[in-house]
């Protein structure tokens, strides 16, 4: 099974099942969270579940998608090396990564013993570069011998199961310092492939969206679980709540003025935003509801 097969295979899995599984799994204890918060850091780049895993750089014959993840931990964030055209285009990059996209050299890398990478002080034939067309922390370029990859941001490092990160920090990953750095906001289907409705490009609406989202309070996983699911009387009722919450998921694509794209989710019936790579949740207030009703419904 090559990396393209893995991509197609995961896209054929029912997204509702994956979303429900993820919502429930976030209530597990710390060791499970720390393991999968890193390993599964980008699956939301392929299918619509909340924990981020890419698995887009696996060797042929590799039957285990976990071992096919070309992950990199860098500056307190998790990334994955990607070369599948459909995925690159989904995130606003050209369908093929080439040498001319490599900017300033940042690090030499080495294999981490699997499909992933780690930084090294020694000179190697694997290098990490800035992405020249749009210098930011959301995208880097990786050269592994003669092969070039995009290295896409997946999520912030999680110190424990209640680590929380503000949306301001997610925006900064893509060099968004104000609403002027956002080109459009678009609702997408669960696979993040088809636009739903018309992209929001009105400057006033984008300014309001940015201002409201950076002001929202951030909840780590443990606090979110308590707020959302602790009031149910038994396990069966709680499981039904998890399913209903997952079924309510909708996706927003944010595109920067440089053309880079990333995604966050929202659950309007339950008043929550799923902060994507922040691995955090945000309570939707009345103003945010009004913006959603005005622009996305």
List the model feature ranges, each with a label.
Residues 1, 5, 35, 40-41, ...:
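Generic structural microfeature
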Residues 1-29:
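Disordered, charged N-terminal biogenesis/targeting segments of membrane/secreted proteins
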Residues 10, 35-60:
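Single-pass transmembrane signal-anchor helices and their membrane-water interface zones
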Residues 18-22, 52, 221:
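Short linear functional motifs in flexible/disordered or boundary regions
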Residues 20-21, 37, 41, 76:
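Short helix-adjacent coil turns
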Residues 28-31, 37:
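Loop-to-transmembrane-helix entry motif
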Residues 59-297:
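Function-determining sites in protein domains
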């Amino acid at each position: 099974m090559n990396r393209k097969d893995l991509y197609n295979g995961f896209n054929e899995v029912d997204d509702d099942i994956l979303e429900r599984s993820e919502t429930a799994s976030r209530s597990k204890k710390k060791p499970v969270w720390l393991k999968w918060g890193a390993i599964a850091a980008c699956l939301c780049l392929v299918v619509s579940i909340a924990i981020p895993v890419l698995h887009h750089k696996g060797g042929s014959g590799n039957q285990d998608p976990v071992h096919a993840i070309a992950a990199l931990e860098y500056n307190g964030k998790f990334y994955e090396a990607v070369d599948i055209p459909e995925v690159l285009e989904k995130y606003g990059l050209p369908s093929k990564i080439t040498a001319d996209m490599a900017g300033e050299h940042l690090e030499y890398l080495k294999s981490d013993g699997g499909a992933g990478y780690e930084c090294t002080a020694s000179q190697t034939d694997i290098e990490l570069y800035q992405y020249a067309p749009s210098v930011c922390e959301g995208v880097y370029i990786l050269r592994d011998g003669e092969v070039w990859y995009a290295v896409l941001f997946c999520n912030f490092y999680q110190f424990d199961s209640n680590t929380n990160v503000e949306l301001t920090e997610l925006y900064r990953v893509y060099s968004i310092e104000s609403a002027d750095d956002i080109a459009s906001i678009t609702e997408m289907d669960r696979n993040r492939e088809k636009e739903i409705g018309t992209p929001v490009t009105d400057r006033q609406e984008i300014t309001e969206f940015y201002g409201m989202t950076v002001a929202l309070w951030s909840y780590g996983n443990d606090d979110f679980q308590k707020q959302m699911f602790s009031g149910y009387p038994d396990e069966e009722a709680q499981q039904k709540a998890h399913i209903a919450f997952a079924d309510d998921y909708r996706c927003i694509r944010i595109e920067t003025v440089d053309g880079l794209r990333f995604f966050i989710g929202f659950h309007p019936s339950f008043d929550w935003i799923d902060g994507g790579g922040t691995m955090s949740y945000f309570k939707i207030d009345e103003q945010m509801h009004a913006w959603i009703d005005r622009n996305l419904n």
